[in-house]
Amino acid sequence: MTPNVLVNGIGASFGIATGPVVILMGPDDFGVMIDDAVLVCPMTTPEWVPVMTRASAIVTDEGGKMSHAAIVCRELGVPAVVGTGSATKDLNGVPTVTVDGSKGEVYGS
């Protein structure tokens, strides 16, 4: 069976993780983050690190292999797909996903 690829991007931190989707558009949304969720956001900056440590995986609209999200995810050992272009839109309403940080793919679960 072929996985249902919902989003493609750059595999920025190796590993595979599954979890509920939480879309955060900025720091004002940090309060809705839940532990072990897949964090989906436009991009990250240093103020995002406390939220990033709670994620099972991270998916961003922007960035590359040397972006803040990619570097922090590698340090934390959290799978990441960056530079998707539209994950915050494409994953809106999707309850759960699996992130493959090696292939740069996000699958519907």
Annotate the PLM regions:
Residues 1-5:
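Long, low-complexity segments enriched in small/aliphatic residues
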Residues 7-37, 42-109:
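Acidic, glycine-rich flexible loop/linker segments
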